[in-house]
Amino acid sequence: MASLSFTQFLSFPRCNADVPCLLQSHGFVKFRGERWNGKQSFSMAAGRRKLSESAPLEEEGNDGNGAVVGKKPSKSVKRTTKKKVVVKDEPLEEISEFLVDNDDVLDKESIVSALKPKKTRTRKKAAAASSDVEEVKTEKKVRRKRTVKKDKDVEDDLATIMDAEVSDVEEALAVESTDTESEEEEIDLSKHEGEDISHTYGWPPLVCCFGSAQHAFVPSGRPANRLLDYELHERMRDAKWAPEKYIRAPGGCAGGVAIALASLGGKVAFMGKLGADDYGQAMLYYLNVCKVQTRSVKIDGKRVTACSTMKISKRGRLKSTCIKPCAEDSLSKSEINVDVLKEAKMFYFSTHSLLDKKMMSTTIQAIKISKQLGNVIFYDLNLPLPLWHSSEETKSFIQEVWNLADVIEITKQELEFLCGIEPTEEFDTENNDISKFVHYPPETVEQLWHENLKVLFVTNGTSKIHYYTKEHNGAVSGMEDVPITPFTRDMSASGDGIVAGLIRMLTVQPDLMNNKGYLERTARYAIECGIIDQWLLAQTRGYPPKDDMEEEEDDEEEDEVESDPNGIRSITEKEYRTSKPYDEPDGPYVMKPVEEREYKKLELVGSMFEDGSL
Protein backbone atom coordinates (compact mmCIF):
# COMPACT_ATOMS: atom_id res chain seq x y z
CA MET A 1 0.00 0.00 0.00
CA ALA A 2 2.93 2.27 0.57
CA SER A 3 3.83 1.96 -3.05
CA LEU A 4 0.24 2.59 -4.04
CA SER A 5 0.08 5.69 -1.89
CA PHE A 6 3.24 6.95 -3.55
CA THR A 7 1.82 6.51 -7.01
CA GLN A 8 -1.40 8.18 -5.93
CA PHE A 9 0.52 11.20 -4.61
CA LEU A 10 2.60 11.34 -7.75
CA SER A 11 -0.44 12.14 -9.87
CA PHE A 12 -1.36 15.31 -7.96
CA PRO A 13 1.72 17.48 -8.55
CA ARG A 14 1.19 17.17 -12.28
CA CYS A 15 -1.66 19.68 -12.10
CA ASN A 16 0.90 22.40 -12.71
CA ALA A 17 2.02 20.75 -15.95
CA ASP A 18 -0.49 21.14 -18.73
CA VAL A 19 -1.31 17.42 -19.19
CA PRO A 20 -4.69 16.88 -20.90
CA CYS A 21 -5.16 13.32 -19.65
CA LEU A 22 -5.36 14.42 -16.02
CA LEU A 23 -7.89 17.16 -16.66
CA GLN A 24 -10.68 14.70 -17.35
CA SER A 25 -9.92 12.25 -14.53
CA HIS A 26 -9.80 14.79 -11.70
CA GLY A 27 -12.37 17.27 -12.97
CA PHE A 28 -10.32 20.47 -13.06
CA VAL A 29 -12.01 23.80 -13.72
CA LYS A 30 -9.79 26.29 -15.56
CA PHE A 31 -10.05 30.04 -14.91
CA ARG A 32 -8.96 32.22 -17.78
CA GLY A 33 -6.26 34.81 -17.35
CA GLU A 34 -4.80 33.33 -14.13
CA ARG A 35 -1.22 32.12 -13.91
CA TRP A 36 0.84 30.74 -11.08
CA ASN A 37 4.59 30.02 -11.19
CA GLY A 38 4.67 30.67 -14.92
CA LYS A 39 1.94 28.08 -15.70
CA GLN A 40 -1.80 28.08 -15.87
CA SER A 41 -3.47 27.36 -12.50
CA PHE A 42 -6.49 25.15 -11.93
CA SER A 43 -9.01 24.79 -9.13
CA MET A 44 -10.20 21.32 -8.31
CA ALA A 45 -13.89 20.66 -7.77
CA ALA A 46 -13.97 17.18 -6.28
CA GLY A 47 -16.74 15.49 -4.34
CA ARG A 48 -16.70 14.39 -0.74
CA ARG A 49 -16.48 10.78 -1.81
CA LYS A 50 -13.10 11.22 -3.54
CA LEU A 51 -11.69 13.22 -0.65
CA SER A 52 -12.84 10.60 1.84
CA GLU A 53 -11.08 7.95 -0.23
CA SER A 54 -7.84 9.86 0.03
CA ALA A 55 -8.11 10.05 3.84
CA PRO A 56 -7.30 6.34 4.56
CA LEU A 57 -4.20 6.67 2.48
CA GLU A 58 -2.88 9.17 4.97
CA GLU A 59 -3.57 6.89 7.90
CA GLU A 60 -1.63 4.04 6.35
CA GLY A 61 1.33 6.19 5.50
CA ASN A 62 1.71 7.72 8.97
CA ASP A 63 2.71 4.53 10.89
CA GLY A 64 0.62 4.86 14.04
CA ASN A 65 -0.09 8.53 13.91
CA GLY A 66 -2.72 8.12 11.25
CA ALA A 67 -5.64 8.38 13.70
CA VAL A 68 -4.65 11.86 14.76
CA VAL A 69 -3.21 13.27 11.58
CA GLY A 70 -5.72 11.64 9.28
CA LYS A 71 -8.76 13.25 10.92
CA LYS A 72 -7.68 16.88 11.06
CA PRO A 73 -6.58 17.20 7.46
CA SER A 74 -9.81 15.54 6.43
CA LYS A 75 -11.77 18.16 8.38
CA SER A 76 -9.92 20.98 6.70
CA VAL A 77 -10.49 19.37 3.34
CA LYS A 78 -14.18 18.99 4.11
CA ARG A 79 -14.38 22.68 4.85
CA THR A 80 -12.92 23.49 1.48
CA THR A 81 -15.29 21.12 -0.24
CA LYS A 82 -18.24 22.67 1.57
CA LYS A 83 -17.31 26.07 0.20
CA LYS A 84 -16.98 24.69 -3.28
CA VAL A 85 -20.31 22.87 -3.07
CA VAL A 86 -22.00 26.11 -2.04
CA VAL A 87 -20.59 27.82 -5.09
CA LYS A 88 -21.85 25.03 -7.31
CA ASP A 89 -25.35 25.08 -5.78
CA GLU A 90 -25.77 28.81 -6.48
CA PRO A 91 -27.92 29.83 -9.45
CA LEU A 92 -26.26 30.77 -12.72
CA GLU A 93 -27.38 34.39 -12.50
CA GLU A 94 -25.65 34.88 -9.16
CA ILE A 95 -22.49 33.29 -10.49
CA SER A 96 -22.47 35.60 -13.51
CA GLU A 97 -22.94 38.61 -11.26
CA PHE A 98 -20.13 37.34 -9.11
CA LEU A 99 -17.85 37.06 -12.10
CA VAL A 100 -18.73 40.49 -13.48
CA ASP A 101 -18.85 42.57 -10.32
CA ASN A 102 -16.16 40.91 -8.22
CA ASP A 103 -13.37 40.07 -10.61
CA ASP A 104 -10.64 40.84 -8.12
CA VAL A 105 -12.18 38.64 -5.42
CA LEU A 106 -12.60 35.79 -7.87
CA ASP A 107 -8.97 36.08 -8.94
CA LYS A 108 -7.79 35.82 -5.35
CA GLU A 109 -10.12 32.91 -4.54
CA SER A 110 -9.03 31.07 -7.67
CA ILE A 111 -5.40 31.44 -6.67
CA VAL A 112 -6.13 30.29 -3.10
CA SER A 113 -8.18 27.35 -4.34
CA ALA A 114 -5.35 26.38 -6.64
CA LEU A 115 -3.00 26.39 -3.68
CA LYS A 116 -5.17 24.31 -1.33
CA PRO A 117 -4.43 20.92 -2.92
CA LYS A 118 -0.76 21.76 -2.64
CA LYS A 119 -1.20 22.50 1.05
CA THR A 120 -2.87 19.14 1.72
CA ARG A 121 -0.05 17.33 -0.05
CA THR A 122 2.60 19.24 1.84
CA ARG A 123 0.80 18.41 5.06
CA LYS A 124 0.79 14.73 4.12
CA LYS A 125 4.50 14.81 3.51
CA ALA A 126 5.13 16.76 6.65
CA ALA A 127 3.00 14.35 8.66
CA ALA A 128 5.50 11.59 8.09
CA ALA A 129 8.10 13.60 9.97
CA SER A 130 5.99 15.39 12.61
CA SER A 131 2.31 15.57 13.54
CA ASP A 132 2.26 19.15 14.71
CA VAL A 133 -0.85 20.87 13.33
CA GLU A 134 0.11 24.38 14.40
CA GLU A 135 3.03 24.49 11.99
CA VAL A 136 0.67 23.75 9.15
CA LYS A 137 -1.54 26.65 10.19
CA THR A 138 1.39 29.06 10.29
CA GLU A 139 2.41 27.91 6.84
CA LYS A 140 -1.09 28.72 5.63
CA LYS A 141 -0.91 32.23 6.99
CA VAL A 142 2.47 32.89 5.45
CA ARG A 143 1.35 31.62 2.09
CA ARG A 144 -1.75 33.77 2.14
CA LYS A 145 0.41 36.83 2.66
CA ARG A 146 2.60 35.82 -0.22
CA THR A 147 -0.39 35.48 -2.51
CA VAL A 148 -1.41 39.05 -1.71
CA LYS A 149 2.06 40.27 -2.56
CA LYS A 150 2.02 38.42 -5.83
CA ASP A 151 -1.37 39.86 -6.66
CA LYS A 152 0.11 43.31 -6.22
CA ASP A 153 3.03 42.37 -8.44
CA VAL A 154 0.62 41.20 -11.12
CA GLU A 155 -1.27 44.48 -10.91
CA ASP A 156 1.98 46.43 -11.18
CA ASP A 157 3.00 44.42 -14.24
CA LEU A 158 -0.35 45.09 -15.87
CA ALA A 159 0.02 48.78 -15.12
CA THR A 160 3.48 48.90 -16.70
CA ILE A 161 2.18 47.08 -19.78
CA MET A 162 -0.68 49.53 -20.12
CA ASP A 163 1.74 52.43 -19.81
CA ALA A 164 3.99 50.94 -22.48
CA GLU A 165 1.10 50.60 -24.91
CA VAL A 166 0.35 54.34 -25.04
CA SER A 167 -0.03 55.49 -28.61
CA ASP A 168 2.07 58.16 -30.29
CA VAL A 169 -0.88 60.54 -30.41
CA GLU A 170 -1.44 60.31 -26.66
CA GLU A 171 2.28 60.81 -26.09
CA ALA A 172 2.24 63.93 -28.24
CA LEU A 173 -0.75 65.24 -26.32
CA ALA A 174 1.04 64.54 -23.06
CA VAL A 175 4.10 66.45 -24.27
CA GLU A 176 1.92 69.37 -25.30
CA SER A 177 0.15 69.41 -21.94
CA THR A 178 3.44 69.39 -20.06
CA ASP A 179 4.72 72.17 -22.27
CA THR A 180 1.65 74.30 -21.59
CA GLU A 181 2.01 73.69 -17.88
CA SER A 182 5.69 74.62 -18.02
CA GLU A 183 4.77 77.83 -19.83
CA GLU A 184 2.51 78.91 -16.99
CA GLU A 185 5.01 78.05 -14.27
CA GLU A 186 8.26 79.94 -13.97
CA ILE A 187 11.45 77.93 -13.86
CA ASP A 188 12.90 77.69 -10.37
CA LEU A 189 16.62 78.42 -10.47
CA SER A 190 17.09 78.51 -6.70
CA LYS A 191 18.76 75.09 -6.66
CA HIS A 192 21.39 76.41 -9.09
CA GLU A 193 22.20 79.45 -6.99
CA GLY A 194 25.68 79.71 -5.57
CA GLU A 195 28.54 82.09 -5.07
CA ASP A 196 28.61 85.02 -7.48
CA ILE A 197 31.60 84.50 -9.79
CA SER A 198 30.61 86.96 -12.50
CA HIS A 199 33.86 88.87 -11.97
CA THR A 200 35.77 85.88 -13.37
CA TYR A 201 33.89 85.72 -16.68
CA GLY A 202 36.26 88.00 -18.61
CA TRP A 203 35.97 89.58 -22.02
CA PRO A 204 34.50 89.14 -24.63
CA PRO A 205 31.11 87.92 -23.40
CA LEU A 206 30.36 84.24 -23.72
CA VAL A 207 27.94 82.99 -26.38
CA CYS A 208 26.19 79.64 -25.96
CA CYS A 209 25.53 77.77 -29.22
CA PHE A 210 22.84 75.16 -28.60
CA GLY A 211 22.10 72.31 -30.98
CA SER A 212 23.95 69.62 -32.88
CA ALA A 213 27.51 69.41 -34.15
CA GLN A 214 27.51 67.49 -37.39
CA HIS A 215 28.17 67.78 -41.09
CA ALA A 216 24.75 68.76 -42.39
CA PHE A 217 23.68 67.84 -45.91
CA VAL A 218 20.91 70.21 -46.98
CA PRO A 219 18.95 70.30 -50.24
CA SER A 220 19.38 73.28 -52.51
CA GLY A 221 16.86 76.08 -52.28
CA ARG A 222 16.57 77.86 -55.64
CA PRO A 223 18.78 79.74 -58.12
CA ALA A 224 20.14 82.93 -56.60
CA ASN A 225 21.30 86.24 -57.98
CA ARG A 226 24.76 87.49 -57.12
CA LEU A 227 26.16 91.00 -56.88
CA LEU A 228 29.49 90.91 -58.73
CA ASP A 229 32.18 93.35 -59.77
CA TYR A 230 32.35 92.27 -63.39
CA GLU A 231 35.39 94.47 -64.14
CA LEU A 232 37.36 92.74 -61.43
CA HIS A 233 36.17 89.39 -62.69
CA GLU A 234 37.31 90.33 -66.18
CA ARG A 235 40.78 91.19 -64.90
CA MET A 236 40.98 87.94 -62.94
CA ARG A 237 38.94 85.77 -65.24
CA ASP A 238 41.26 82.84 -64.61
CA ALA A 239 39.93 82.78 -61.06
CA LYS A 240 36.33 82.87 -62.16
CA TRP A 241 34.52 79.57 -62.24
CA ALA A 242 31.03 80.00 -63.67
CA PRO A 243 28.67 77.08 -63.11
CA GLU A 244 25.25 76.99 -64.72
CA LYS A 245 23.34 78.01 -61.59
CA TYR A 246 24.22 79.50 -58.23
CA ILE A 247 22.19 78.13 -55.35
CA ARG A 248 21.29 79.66 -52.00
CA ALA A 249 21.19 76.94 -49.34
CA PRO A 250 20.75 77.13 -45.55
CA GLY A 251 23.78 77.46 -43.37
CA GLY A 252 25.28 74.81 -41.16
CA CYS A 253 24.40 73.66 -37.68
CA ALA A 254 25.21 75.16 -34.28
CA GLY A 255 28.65 73.54 -34.24
CA GLY A 256 29.66 75.34 -37.45
CA VAL A 257 28.54 78.71 -36.08
CA ALA A 258 30.47 78.06 -32.85
CA ILE A 259 33.66 77.30 -34.77
CA ALA A 260 33.22 80.37 -37.00
CA LEU A 261 32.64 82.61 -33.97
CA ALA A 262 35.71 81.22 -32.20
CA SER A 263 37.82 81.91 -35.30
CA LEU A 264 36.72 85.58 -35.10
CA GLY A 265 38.11 85.87 -31.58
CA GLY A 266 34.84 85.37 -29.73
CA LYS A 267 34.29 83.32 -26.62
CA VAL A 268 31.82 80.55 -27.36
CA ALA A 269 30.60 77.40 -25.62
CA PHE A 270 28.83 74.59 -27.43
CA MET A 271 25.95 72.82 -25.66
CA GLY A 272 24.75 69.54 -27.09
CA LYS A 273 25.26 65.79 -27.11
CA LEU A 274 27.61 63.63 -29.14
CA GLY A 275 27.85 59.90 -29.63
CA ALA A 276 30.62 57.82 -28.10
CA ASP A 277 31.67 56.53 -31.54
CA ASP A 278 34.44 57.66 -33.87
CA TYR A 279 32.33 60.42 -35.41
CA GLY A 280 31.46 61.94 -32.05
CA GLN A 281 35.03 61.75 -30.76
CA ALA A 282 36.36 63.37 -33.94
CA MET A 283 33.82 66.19 -33.69
CA LEU A 284 34.66 66.76 -30.02
CA TYR A 285 38.36 66.90 -30.85
CA TYR A 286 37.75 69.37 -33.67
CA LEU A 287 35.73 71.65 -31.38
CA ASN A 288 38.54 71.68 -28.83
CA VAL A 289 41.16 72.39 -31.50
CA CYS A 290 39.10 75.36 -32.72
CA LYS A 291 39.01 76.76 -29.14
CA VAL A 292 35.33 76.09 -28.53
CA GLN A 293 34.44 75.38 -24.91
CA THR A 294 33.06 71.85 -24.56
CA ARG A 295 32.29 71.75 -20.83
CA SER A 296 28.56 71.53 -21.57
CA VAL A 297 28.89 68.71 -24.13
CA LYS A 298 27.41 65.36 -23.09
CA ILE A 299 28.62 62.01 -24.42
CA ASP A 300 25.95 59.37 -25.03
CA GLY A 301 27.18 55.80 -24.82
CA LYS A 302 23.85 54.23 -25.78
CA ARG A 303 23.11 56.12 -29.01
CA VAL A 304 25.45 56.72 -31.91
CA THR A 305 26.02 59.72 -34.14
CA ALA A 306 23.41 60.37 -36.81
CA CYS A 307 24.54 59.17 -40.20
CA SER A 308 23.09 57.71 -43.35
CA THR A 309 24.46 54.54 -44.89
CA MET A 310 23.92 53.33 -48.43
CA LYS A 311 24.42 49.85 -49.80
CA ILE A 312 23.80 48.06 -53.07
CA SER A 313 21.12 45.40 -52.96
CA LYS A 314 21.21 42.08 -54.80
CA ARG A 315 19.27 43.56 -57.68
CA GLY A 316 21.70 46.44 -58.01
CA ARG A 317 19.54 49.09 -56.38
CA LEU A 318 20.71 51.54 -53.74
CA LYS A 319 19.26 51.26 -50.25
CA SER A 320 19.77 53.98 -47.67
CA THR A 321 19.23 53.71 -43.94
CA CYS A 322 19.32 56.47 -41.35
CA ILE A 323 20.14 56.06 -37.66
CA LYS A 324 17.23 57.29 -35.56
CA PRO A 325 17.12 58.19 -32.71
CA CYS A 326 20.62 59.58 -32.65
CA ALA A 327 22.80 61.05 -29.94
CA GLU A 328 22.38 64.62 -31.21
CA ASP A 329 18.62 64.53 -30.55
CA SER A 330 18.74 62.86 -27.12
CA LEU A 331 19.75 65.78 -24.88
CA SER A 332 17.36 65.87 -21.90
CA LYS A 333 16.26 68.80 -19.77
CA SER A 334 18.27 67.58 -16.78
CA GLU A 335 21.47 67.73 -18.85
CA ILE A 336 21.24 71.48 -19.49
CA ASN A 337 24.30 73.20 -18.00
CA VAL A 338 22.82 76.19 -16.16
CA ASP A 339 26.27 77.50 -15.20
CA VAL A 340 27.10 78.08 -18.87
CA LEU A 341 23.78 79.88 -19.39
CA LYS A 342 24.54 82.10 -16.39
CA GLU A 343 27.86 83.17 -17.85
CA ALA A 344 26.58 83.57 -21.40
CA LYS A 345 25.15 86.84 -22.68
CA MET A 346 23.62 85.41 -25.86
CA PHE A 347 21.91 82.10 -26.63
CA TYR A 348 22.05 80.86 -30.23
CA PHE A 349 19.92 78.07 -31.74
CA SER A 350 18.46 77.07 -35.10
CA THR A 351 15.58 75.02 -36.46
CA HIS A 352 17.73 71.87 -36.49
CA SER A 353 17.17 71.45 -32.74
CA LEU A 354 13.37 71.60 -33.15
CA LEU A 355 12.85 68.66 -35.50
CA ASP A 356 12.74 66.04 -32.73
CA LYS A 357 9.94 66.24 -30.12
CA LYS A 358 12.13 65.59 -27.07
CA MET A 359 14.89 67.84 -28.36
CA MET A 360 12.33 70.56 -29.03
CA SER A 361 11.13 70.50 -25.41
CA THR A 362 14.75 70.64 -24.21
CA THR A 363 15.45 73.59 -26.51
CA ILE A 364 12.42 75.50 -25.26
CA GLN A 365 13.47 74.80 -21.67
CA ALA A 366 16.98 76.15 -22.34
CA ILE A 367 15.52 79.24 -24.05
CA LYS A 368 13.28 79.99 -21.08
CA ILE A 369 16.17 79.62 -18.65
CA SER A 370 18.27 81.98 -20.76
CA LYS A 371 15.43 84.50 -20.94
CA GLN A 372 15.04 84.34 -17.17
CA LEU A 373 18.77 84.99 -16.78
CA GLY A 374 18.58 88.04 -19.06
CA ASN A 375 20.35 86.62 -22.13
CA VAL A 376 19.72 87.73 -25.70
CA ILE A 377 18.05 84.98 -27.77
CA PHE A 378 19.39 84.68 -31.34
CA TYR A 379 17.29 82.51 -33.66
CA ASP A 380 18.80 81.38 -36.97
CA LEU A 381 15.95 79.98 -39.06
CA ASN A 382 18.01 77.75 -41.40
CA LEU A 383 14.92 76.40 -43.12
CA PRO A 384 15.45 73.96 -46.04
CA LEU A 385 12.57 75.15 -48.22
CA PRO A 386 12.02 71.91 -50.22
CA LEU A 387 11.18 70.07 -46.99
CA TRP A 388 8.12 72.22 -46.20
CA HIS A 389 4.75 72.15 -47.92
CA SER A 390 3.34 75.56 -47.01
CA SER A 391 4.11 78.68 -45.02
CA GLU A 392 1.20 77.95 -42.64
CA GLU A 393 2.76 74.64 -41.66
CA THR A 394 6.11 76.30 -41.07
CA LYS A 395 4.63 79.15 -39.03
CA SER A 396 2.71 76.77 -36.76
CA PHE A 397 5.88 74.73 -36.21
CA ILE A 398 8.18 77.62 -35.30
CA GLN A 399 5.60 79.92 -33.71
CA GLU A 400 6.59 79.33 -30.07
CA VAL A 401 10.34 79.80 -30.47
CA TRP A 402 9.79 82.67 -32.92
CA ASN A 403 7.94 84.64 -30.24
CA LEU A 404 10.72 84.03 -27.70
CA ALA A 405 13.57 85.30 -29.90
CA ASP A 406 15.12 88.77 -29.55
CA VAL A 407 17.17 88.65 -32.77
CA ILE A 408 16.20 86.62 -35.85
CA GLU A 409 18.26 85.98 -38.97
CA ILE A 410 16.54 84.66 -42.10
CA THR A 411 17.42 84.61 -45.77
CA LYS A 412 15.61 86.56 -48.45
CA GLN A 413 14.15 83.35 -49.85
CA GLU A 414 12.86 82.33 -46.41
CA LEU A 415 11.25 85.75 -45.95
CA GLU A 416 9.43 85.42 -49.27
CA PHE A 417 8.35 81.90 -48.36
CA LEU A 418 6.91 82.91 -44.97
CA CYS A 419 5.21 86.05 -46.28
CA GLY A 420 3.92 84.44 -49.47
CA ILE A 421 5.78 86.82 -51.80
CA GLU A 422 6.49 85.86 -55.39
CA PRO A 423 10.00 87.06 -56.36
CA THR A 424 10.22 89.50 -59.26
CA GLU A 425 13.97 89.24 -59.79
CA GLU A 426 15.70 88.59 -63.08
CA PHE A 427 18.12 85.73 -62.80
CA ASP A 428 21.37 85.18 -64.69
CA THR A 429 21.78 88.82 -65.65
CA GLU A 430 24.77 91.14 -65.33
CA ASN A 431 22.62 93.96 -64.00
CA ASN A 432 23.88 95.25 -60.65
CA ASP A 433 21.07 97.74 -60.24
CA ILE A 434 19.59 98.16 -56.78
CA SER A 435 16.30 96.73 -58.05
CA LYS A 436 18.04 93.39 -58.47
CA PHE A 437 17.79 92.87 -54.71
CA VAL A 438 14.53 94.37 -53.52
CA HIS A 439 14.36 95.84 -50.02
CA TYR A 440 10.84 95.08 -48.82
CA PRO A 441 9.08 97.81 -46.81
CA PRO A 442 8.34 97.35 -43.10
CA GLU A 443 4.65 96.81 -43.88
CA THR A 444 5.54 93.56 -45.63
CA VAL A 445 7.61 92.29 -42.70
CA GLU A 446 5.04 93.44 -40.14
CA GLN A 447 3.21 90.11 -40.20
CA LEU A 448 6.34 88.42 -38.83
CA TRP A 449 6.91 90.95 -36.05
CA HIS A 450 6.19 90.39 -32.35
CA GLU A 451 6.64 92.43 -29.21
CA ASN A 452 9.85 90.71 -28.03
CA LEU A 453 11.65 91.06 -31.38
CA LYS A 454 14.36 93.73 -31.47
CA VAL A 455 16.18 93.17 -34.76
CA LEU A 456 15.31 91.15 -37.86
CA PHE A 457 18.18 90.48 -40.31
CA VAL A 458 17.39 89.38 -43.86
CA THR A 459 20.51 88.11 -45.62
CA ASN A 460 21.19 87.34 -49.26
CA GLY A 461 24.64 85.88 -48.95
CA THR A 462 27.36 88.51 -49.03
CA SER A 463 25.53 90.44 -51.76
CA LYS A 464 23.17 92.30 -49.44
CA ILE A 465 22.00 92.29 -45.81
CA HIS A 466 18.73 93.95 -44.76
CA TYR A 467 17.89 94.95 -41.18
CA TYR A 468 14.55 95.85 -39.56
CA THR A 469 13.81 97.35 -36.14
CA LYS A 470 10.80 99.11 -34.67
CA GLU A 471 12.25 102.51 -35.59
CA HIS A 472 14.68 101.88 -38.46
CA ASN A 473 15.15 99.70 -41.52
CA GLY A 474 17.71 99.62 -44.29
CA ALA A 475 20.16 97.50 -46.27
CA VAL A 476 23.90 97.23 -46.81
CA SER A 477 25.22 96.08 -50.19
CA GLY A 478 28.23 93.84 -50.36
CA MET A 479 30.02 91.78 -52.97
CA GLU A 480 30.42 88.12 -53.70
CA ASP A 481 33.87 86.59 -53.73
CA VAL A 482 35.93 86.58 -56.91
CA PRO A 483 37.43 83.08 -56.97
CA ILE A 484 34.44 80.76 -57.01
CA THR A 485 35.65 77.18 -56.85
CA PRO A 486 33.81 74.03 -57.88
CA PHE A 487 33.24 73.38 -54.18
CA THR A 488 31.31 76.59 -53.45
CA ARG A 489 28.55 76.24 -55.96
CA ASP A 490 25.76 76.16 -53.37
CA MET A 491 26.88 79.54 -51.95
CA SER A 492 26.42 78.26 -48.38
CA ALA A 493 30.08 78.63 -47.43
CA SER A 494 29.53 82.12 -46.08
CA GLY A 495 26.37 81.34 -44.07
CA ASP A 496 28.11 80.50 -40.81
CA GLY A 497 30.57 83.37 -41.25
CA ILE A 498 27.77 85.93 -41.68
CA VAL A 499 25.90 84.71 -38.60
CA ALA A 500 29.11 84.64 -36.57
CA GLY A 501 29.88 88.22 -37.63
CA LEU A 502 26.43 89.41 -36.55
CA ILE A 503 26.74 87.66 -33.18
CA ARG A 504 30.24 89.04 -32.62
CA MET A 505 29.13 92.65 -33.08
CA LEU A 506 25.89 92.35 -31.11
CA THR A 507 27.54 90.76 -28.07
CA VAL A 508 30.23 93.44 -27.86
CA GLN A 509 27.76 96.36 -27.89
CA PRO A 510 24.30 95.04 -26.95
CA ASP A 511 23.13 98.53 -25.95
CA LEU A 512 23.48 99.73 -29.56
CA MET A 513 21.22 97.05 -30.95
CA ASN A 514 18.64 99.63 -32.07
CA ASN A 515 21.19 102.15 -33.36
CA LYS A 516 20.95 102.48 -37.15
CA GLY A 517 24.62 103.37 -37.63
CA TYR A 518 25.80 100.47 -35.52
CA LEU A 519 23.49 98.05 -37.34
CA GLU A 520 24.98 99.12 -40.68
CA ARG A 521 28.48 98.57 -39.31
CA THR A 522 27.36 95.17 -38.05
CA ALA A 523 25.98 94.18 -41.46
CA ARG A 524 29.15 95.37 -43.21
CA TYR A 525 31.33 93.41 -40.79
CA ALA A 526 29.22 90.29 -41.35
CA ILE A 527 29.61 90.65 -45.14
CA GLU A 528 33.39 90.85 -44.77
CA CYS A 529 33.38 87.76 -42.57
CA GLY A 530 31.35 85.89 -45.18
CA ILE A 531 33.72 86.88 -47.98
CA ILE A 532 36.73 85.79 -45.93
CA ASP A 533 34.96 82.52 -45.26
CA GLN A 534 34.56 81.93 -48.98
CA TRP A 535 38.19 82.79 -49.63
CA LEU A 536 39.34 80.44 -46.90
CA LEU A 537 37.18 77.68 -48.32
CA ALA A 538 38.71 78.26 -51.73
CA GLN A 539 42.16 78.23 -50.17
CA THR A 540 41.46 74.97 -48.38
CA ARG A 541 39.77 73.09 -51.22
CA GLY A 542 41.74 74.44 -54.15
CA TYR A 543 41.34 76.56 -57.28
CA PRO A 544 40.40 75.57 -60.82
CA PRO A 545 43.46 74.97 -62.99
CA LYS A 546 44.28 77.24 -65.91
CA ASP A 547 44.10 76.19 -69.51
CA ASP A 548 47.85 76.32 -70.14
CA MET A 549 48.51 74.22 -67.05
CA GLU A 550 46.10 71.58 -68.31
CA GLU A 551 47.85 71.42 -71.68
CA GLU A 552 51.28 71.10 -70.07
CA GLU A 553 49.94 68.46 -67.78
CA ASP A 554 48.79 66.32 -70.68
CA ASP A 555 52.23 66.54 -72.29
CA GLU A 556 54.53 66.22 -69.29
CA GLU A 557 53.26 65.27 -65.83
CA GLU A 558 50.00 64.91 -64.04
CA ASP A 559 51.29 65.48 -60.52
CA GLU A 560 50.97 69.27 -60.49
CA VAL A 561 47.21 69.30 -60.93
CA GLU A 562 45.46 67.32 -58.26
CA SER A 563 42.10 65.67 -58.85
CA ASP A 564 39.62 64.42 -56.29
CA PRO A 565 37.66 61.13 -56.54
CA ASN A 566 34.90 62.97 -58.44
CA GLY A 567 37.29 64.00 -61.19
CA ILE A 568 37.37 67.71 -60.29
CA ARG A 569 40.88 69.06 -60.89
CA SER A 570 42.26 71.84 -58.75
CA ILE A 571 45.51 73.57 -57.91
CA THR A 572 46.84 75.08 -54.71
CA GLU A 573 46.70 78.77 -53.85
CA LYS A 574 50.47 79.12 -54.27
CA GLU A 575 50.33 77.70 -57.78
CA TYR A 576 47.40 79.94 -58.60
CA ARG A 577 49.12 83.09 -57.30
CA THR A 578 52.54 82.47 -58.84
CA SER A 579 51.47 81.23 -62.28
CA LYS A 580 50.95 83.72 -65.12
CA PRO A 581 47.83 83.87 -67.25
CA TYR A 582 48.34 82.35 -70.66
CA ASP A 583 47.06 85.43 -72.52
CA GLU A 584 48.61 88.16 -70.34
CA PRO A 585 52.24 87.25 -69.71
CA ASP A 586 53.13 90.64 -68.26
CA GLY A 587 49.82 91.84 -66.90
CA PRO A 588 49.83 94.48 -64.15
CA TYR A 589 47.64 92.37 -61.88
CA VAL A 590 49.81 89.27 -61.93
CA MET A 591 51.46 88.41 -58.63
CA LYS A 592 55.09 87.55 -59.35
CA PRO A 593 57.12 85.02 -57.40
CA VAL A 594 58.95 86.25 -54.33
CA GLU A 595 62.41 86.06 -55.90
CA GLU A 596 61.31 88.20 -58.87
CA ARG A 597 59.61 90.96 -56.91
CA GLU A 598 61.14 94.45 -56.85
CA TYR A 599 60.81 96.73 -53.86
CA LYS A 600 61.20 100.51 -54.06
CA LYS A 601 62.33 102.71 -51.22
CA LEU A 602 59.80 105.36 -50.21
CA GLU A 603 61.09 108.94 -50.22
CA LEU A 604 59.85 111.79 -48.08
CA VAL A 605 57.57 113.96 -50.19
CA GLY A 606 56.90 116.90 -47.87
CA SER A 607 56.63 118.00 -44.26
CA MET A 608 53.82 119.25 -42.10
CA PHE A 609 55.75 122.19 -40.61
CA GLU A 610 57.94 124.90 -42.11
CA ASP A 611 61.03 123.91 -40.10
CA GLY A 612 60.98 120.48 -41.73
CA SER A 613 59.95 118.54 -38.67
CA LEU A 614 57.24 115.95 -38.95
From Swiss-Prot:
It comes from the Eukaryota. Keywords: Chloroplast, Kinase, Plastid, Transcription, Transcription regulation, Transferase, Transit peptide. Coiled coil: none annotated. Disruption phenotype: Plants display chlorosis prior to leaf expansion, but exhibit slow greening, remain autotrophic, can grow to maturity, and set viable seed. Albino phenotype of seedlings grown on sucrose-free medium associated with reduced plastid-encoded RNA polymerase (PEP)-dependent gene expression and altered chloroplast development. Delayed greening of seedlings grown on sucrose-containing medium. One of its GO terms (biological process) is regulation of DNA-templated transcription. Interacts with CITRX/TRXz. Binds to FLN1 and PTAC5. Associates with the plastid-encoded RNA polymerase (PEP) complex. This is Fructokinase-like 2, chloroplastic. It comes from Arabidopsis thaliana (Mouse-ear cress). The lineage of its organism: Eukaryota, Viridiplantae, Streptophyta, Embryophyta, Tracheophyta.
